[in-house]
Amino acid sequence: MAVKNYKPTSPGRRFVTFSDFSEITKVEPEKSLLEPIKKTGGRNAQGRLTVRHQGGGHKRMFRIIDFKRNKDGIPAKVASIEYDPNRSARIALLNYADGEKRYILAPVGLEVGVIVESGPDADIKVGNCLPLRNIPVGTMVHNIELYPGAGAQMVRSAGAAAQLMAKEGKYANLRLPSGEMRLVLQECRATIGQVGNLEHENVTIGKAGRSRHLGIRPTVRGKVMNPVDHPHGGGEGRNPIGRNPSTPWGKLAMGVKTRGNKKSDRLIVKRRNKK
């Protein structure tokens, strides 16, 4: 994959960059693995705004992704590499030997025609899924479970990979993309390799309309709102905030930790790197 740049033939083209989609081998998705998505506009069941900056965007269908990889011992052939509008990574369509079809995240190096499998006895090969206890130390992995059998929850975005650093007792020590060192049960499964679409981080949206197509609404500064809408709002003309920077709900915004304590904190060996 590469990033395409354009000559500035218009203001909208001046800064915009696109993926060249060279790795995509099939345009139409597998219909049996599609589900409709109902847009929420960031509202909950009561109709109240709970997530800002969401709404609009192009209509999408959800691709059902196999995050559990629980068809052990049955080989699958990669039929195609496809675009998924719901995530930054590409997805791969697998045709299993028993006739079933499933989507998985497409790692770097996975090509059409390659055979992949899952289970404790699978080979250490890109795209194969195994329990952490069966993966050699030092291997790069993605699509990692936090609880055995629950399905992968970590390291799923484009270009992401974690490294298996050590094994001790019933836990494996993983270095996550954030720099965090975390213990995960060795019975949890992970997929060998790095998530594909490596150049995703280098793509520039470039214009407001493209954000709207993606379902991202504008971010408005609190300073330009009215006092009823934001603690920073109001005043005559341009003026300072007049208080410590705050969220729209009045909580301190700069440098205040918002993460609550969890029982699983004991499994974090080292916190993530500071930005």
UniProtKB/Swiss-Prot annotation:
Signal peptide positions on this chain: none
Key words of the record: Ribonucleoprotein, Ribosomal protein, RNA-binding, rRNA-binding
SMART domains for this protein: Ribosomal_L2, Ribosomal_L2_C
GO biological process assignments: cytoplasmic translation
Residue ranges of the region described as Disordered: 222-275
GO CC term (a single one): large ribosomal subunit
InterPro entries: NA-bd_OB-fold, Rib_uL2_dom2, Ribosomal_uL2, Ribosomal_uL2_bac/org-type, Ribosomal_uL2_C, Ribosomal_uL2_dom3, Ribosomal_uL2_RNA-bd_dom, Translation_prot_SH3-like_sf
Gene Ontology molecular function: rRNA binding; structural constituent of ribosome; transferase activity
One Pfam family, short name: Ribosomal_L2
Keyword flag Ribosomal protein: yes
Superkingdom in the source lineage: Bacteria
Subunit and interaction comment: Part of the 50S ribosomal subunit. Forms a bridge to the 30S subunit in the 70S ribosome.
HAMAP family for the chain: Ribosomal_uL2_B
Function of the molecule: One of the primary rRNA binding proteins. Required for association of the 30S and 50S subunits to form the 70S ribosome, for tRNA binding and peptide bond formation. It has been suggested to have peptidyltransferase activity; this is somewhat controversial. Makes several contacts with the 16S rRNA in the 70S ribosome.
Family per record: Belongs to the universal ribosomal protein uL2 family.
NCBIfam families: rplB_bact (TIGR01171)
Protein name: Large ribosomal subunit protein uL2
